[in-house]
Amino acid sequence: SSSNETANTQTRTITDSIGRQVVLPRNISRAAITNAYNAELITAIGAADKIAGVDYYIYQDQEGFKNRFTENMLIGSRQGGLNYEKIADMNPDVLIICENDSWETAQERLRPFGIPVVVCNSYYTSQFAENTALLGQIFGMEKNAEELSSFFLSRLDYIDKQLKDVPRRSVYFEYRTPGRTTIPGDYFYEMIEKAHADNIFKTAQATQIQIEDVVHKNPAFIVKVSDANVYSSYIPPKKEDMEKIWNDICLRPGWSDMDAIKQNHILLLSHYAHGGASKLVGTMYIAKFLYPDKLPDLHPEEVFKKWVTVYEGLEYQTGHTFPAYELND
């Protein structure tokens, strides 16, 4: 097409999350994307109107994206496979996917159509600044990306400064189902690490552990991402559902003598709240939960409110944590 003949004057090369050099059109007006973490960051830098195609994972949280994604924008199935025919028909300027979305296949299938594929792993907490900058570069929103990054990084710096010489407090982290914890390399590991927690399973070989091992390790705190539903939703869980999850934890065989249970040191986070800003919102809650006395100027609920209202453009809703955090906590 004629647009391709002049492409050499209107392209640029970016480096994606996994170090691939990708040639992109100078202006991106229509992007197909996968993964809610990517969708949230793109929204947070002010480029939501450039999203032309989404996977099922993004599509199903209608309220979280203001119902802007319609069924004809779907590029993937409920099972997570991508529909390359649909993407080719859509002919976006770029497909932005995650490393775990089989990007090699995407690259191969879309090359004949001249649709570039960018890998952006927004679910990795430790890559938040790099991925925000990458998306800022892709959409020409560098200034917004810079502002978003510094909002969160300044708070991480505060946590690091305040807790520099403080012994780490032990935490058992659980994701959704009993015994599903986090280890180095897993999606949740850095969220816990950046909160200066001592993850009791940091040397475990797999993310699924035996429940009785938690008893032996006797953590001082328990943090659980509580929704049984795998999908993230902006609508908070019902309070009675949170209470039931809390009670179920306390009633696990042999757990009543555990320090965390005796002290009522249990924090439940909704899927949505823990995940904000590549899980840095989760980090803020966990840090404050573990070290309330050391972090007087960190207010996680305030951070969550700003994430939701300023960056995602949504109304603030309470109920995403249990026990509830007040704005000034």
Model-based region annotation:
Residues 37-40, 57-60, 94-95, 100-104, ...:
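Solvent-exposed loop/turn segments at secondary-structure junctions
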